[in-house]
């Protein structure tokens, strides 16, 4: 049974709902200075996958249990939601769906805003836009859309483009 002091001093653990996160995409990747468009309108789901390469070894001294080594990762951010025509970020992304090679390469950064209103850039990366779908769903619904933002090389923790 908790004491009165336990009740008075209770602190609820902090959580960060996904709406505290934001993402931006560079719509002029070949320019000297990025032109950032906020990825927001229409997207209602974001998921991170590290896509790890794990080497698993069962050494004699492990008594039948493995030793795991993460030897590589291919980070991907998947965004999905509803297609919004006229939105700068979505028009840029889905305007690339029939492009090949370097024409799908751009820059990406993800941020988070804390309870005090301070925004911090968590990661920034060179990316390739993959597996885009912007025509999908039932006839009475707004078209479902999705895109995979795949990192090229290691991401930078922070804002690589900060002045």
Residue spans for each PLM region:
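Glycine- and charge-rich intrinsically disordered segments
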Residues: 1-2, 163
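Short, acidic/charged, Gly/Pro-enriched secondary-structure junctions
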Residues: 90-126
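Short beta-strand and beta-hairpin "edge-sheet" elements
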Residues: 111-159
């Amino acid at each position: 049974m908790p004491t009165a002091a336990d009740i008075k001093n209770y602190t609820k653990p902090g959580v960060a709902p996904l709406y505290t996160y934001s993402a931006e995409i560079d719509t002029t990747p070949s320019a000297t200075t990025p032109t950032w468009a906020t990825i927001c309108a229409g997207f209602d789901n974001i998921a991170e996958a590290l896509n790890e390469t794990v080497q698993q070894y069962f050494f004699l001294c492990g008594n039948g249990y493995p030793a795991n080594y993460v030897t590589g990762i291919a980070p991907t951010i998947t965004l999905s939601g509803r297609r919004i025509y006229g939105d700068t970020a979505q028009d840029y992304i889905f305007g690339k769906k029939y492009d090949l090679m370097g024409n799908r390469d751009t820059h990406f950064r993800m941020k988070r805003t804390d309870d005090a209103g301070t925004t911090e850039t968590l990661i920034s990366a060179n990316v390739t836009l993959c597996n885009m779908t912007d025509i999908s769903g039932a006839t009475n619904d707004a078209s479902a859309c999705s895109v995979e933002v795949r990192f090229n090389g290691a991401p930078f923790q922070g804002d690589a483009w900060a002045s």
